[in-house]
């Protein structure tokens, strides 16, 4: 039989076991354990002491490699009563002491503090107060006094009263430039003055039918005369020049100008839209793109606004002004402002109004002696208007909206200008 193997006795472990046993015997002999054990945290200890963080031990008496290191440490404290600890309680903050606010206003007079408040009384009803229940109109709309004259917005926008004098002086200088040459028809080889009269008479009808502005008509005739002053035109192309000039003037003056196809259509499709556009391009090159020119119509409207003319005076003045478009030879030698002044003076004289008051002298800078020759020519033209071959202007101003100023049976033209003391 083999002998029983010998147990290895570890002296160190034996000593530890003896220590453990002695510790247990000493702890149990002094105090017996109750049913649920002895509660070391007594109930009457209400305050918990905040445990402090223990410092890291410098070294252990046992090697970290020893598997019984933790057992040994626990063996020393097993059965011992743990140290008591308390709970940290924040101290109750004291109530803040409120200080009485300091007033920035001191020494208020007693007269102000003892004022008695008077209750508001009801305001009796007034007939001027508008009741919203009885009126459907806005209470903010107030009637203007009858004697107050309404503002002429168009006059303010177009004339700009602050710069009216500067604008007028500038246009007086501009009218001397870009003028048609008087007597240019003598240098034309294939067209005559009567052909031009027929063309302008046709353009008057076109502008009236298409409801174009009067300024558009005057601009178109200005482009025609300036173009014919520099370029010889065949009679077969004269109507094309007129249509292209009116098309250019409409694009410059009108807000919604007619389409180029309409100008080709009014020629009974004699010319195509492409031909009208090509002629427009040629006219612009010949005129060097100077299309913004002052016309007789512009000066006439400016003079009429300055003298507060009524509708009949305006219509008669415009009728006399348009008569100058037909007769080229007599009026190309006059400046547009001179022609406008003569037309206004003759219209006032025909209606029995003072022909040329001082306010017009101040406005225009003209005396009657400055335009007396144009006045005589215009008087002669108006006397022969009824017998003229071209009657478009006559028929236009026989309408009621123009007060039938071209009907000489109702508005006869003075036979002489003797009362003007010329």
UniProtKB/Swiss-Prot annotation:
One biological process term in Gene Ontology: cell division
Keywords: Cell cycle, Cell division, Cyclin, Mitosis
PROSITE patterns: CYCLINS
InterPro entries xrefs: Cyclin, Cyclin-A_N, Cyclin-like_dom, Cyclin-like_sf, Cyclin_A/B-like, Cyclin_C-dom, Cyclin_N, Cyclins_cyclin-box
Cell cycle as UniProt keyword: yes
Keyword Cell cycle: yes
GO molecular-function term, one example from the UniProt record: cyclin-dependent protein serine/threonine kinase regulator activity
Region Disordered, annotated ranges: 1-29
Family: Belongs to the cyclin family. Cyclin AB subfamily.
Matching PANTHER family: CYCLINS
Known role: Essential for the control of the cell cycle at the G2/M (mitosis) transition. Interacts with the CDC2 and CDK2 protein kinases to form MPF. G2/M cyclins accumulate steadily during G2 and are abruptly destroyed at mitosis.
Protein's name in the database: G2/mitotic-specific cyclin-A
Annotated source species: Spisula solidissima (Atlantic surf-clam)
């Amino acid at each position: 039989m083999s002998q029983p193997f010998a147990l290895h006795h570890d002296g160190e472990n034996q000593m530890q076991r003896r220590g453990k046993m002695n510790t247990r015997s000493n702890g149990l002999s002094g105090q017996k354990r109750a049913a649920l054990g002895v509660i070391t945290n007594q109930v009457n200890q209400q305050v918990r002491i905040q445990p402090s963080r223990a410092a890291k031990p410098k070294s252990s008496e046992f090697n970290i490699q020893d598997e019984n290191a933790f057992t040994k440490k626990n063996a020393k404290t097993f059965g011992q009563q743990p140290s008591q600890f308390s709970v940290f309680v924040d101290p109750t903050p004291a109530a803040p002491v409120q200080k009485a606010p300091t007033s920035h206003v001191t020494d208020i007079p007693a007269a102000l503090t003892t004022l008695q408040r008077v209750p508001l009384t009801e305001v009796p009803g007034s007939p001027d107060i508008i009741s919203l229940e009885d009126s459907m109109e806005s209470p903010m709309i107030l009637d203007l006094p009858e004697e107050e004259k309404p503002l002429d917005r168009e006059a303010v926008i177009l004339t700009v009263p602050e710069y009216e004098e500067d604008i007028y002086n500038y246009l007086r200088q501009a009218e001397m430039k870009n003028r048609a040459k008087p007597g240019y028809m003598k240098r034309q080889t294939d067209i005559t003055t009567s052909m031009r009269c027929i063309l302008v008479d046709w353009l008057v009808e076109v502008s009236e039918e298409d409801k174009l502005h009067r300024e558009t008509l005057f601009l178109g005739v200005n482009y025609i005369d300036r173009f014919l002053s520099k370029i010889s035109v065949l009679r077969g192309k004269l109507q094309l020049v007129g249509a292209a000039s009116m098309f250019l003037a409409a694009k410059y003056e009108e807000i919604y100008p007619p389409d180029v196809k309409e100008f080709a259509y009014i020629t009974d499709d004699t010319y195509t839209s492409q031909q009208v556009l090509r002629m427009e391009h040629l006219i612009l090159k010949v005129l060097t793109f100077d299309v913004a020119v002052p016309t007789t119509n512009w000066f006439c409207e400016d003079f009429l606004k300055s003298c507060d003319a009524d509708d009949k005076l305006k219509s008669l003045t415009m009728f006399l002004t348009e008569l100058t478009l037909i007769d080229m030879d007599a009026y190309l030698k006059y400046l547009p402002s001179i022609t406008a002044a003569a037309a206004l003076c003759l219209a006032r004289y025909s209606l029995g109004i003072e022909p040329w008051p001082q306010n017009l002298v101040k406005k225009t800078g003209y005396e009657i002696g400055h335009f007396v020759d144009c006045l005589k020519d215009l008087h002669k033209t108006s006397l022969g208007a009824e017998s003229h071959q071209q009657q478009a202007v006559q028929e236009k101003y026989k309408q009621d909206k123009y007060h039938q100023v071209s009907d000489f049976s109702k508005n006869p033209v003075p036979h002489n200008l003797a009362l003007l003391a010329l």
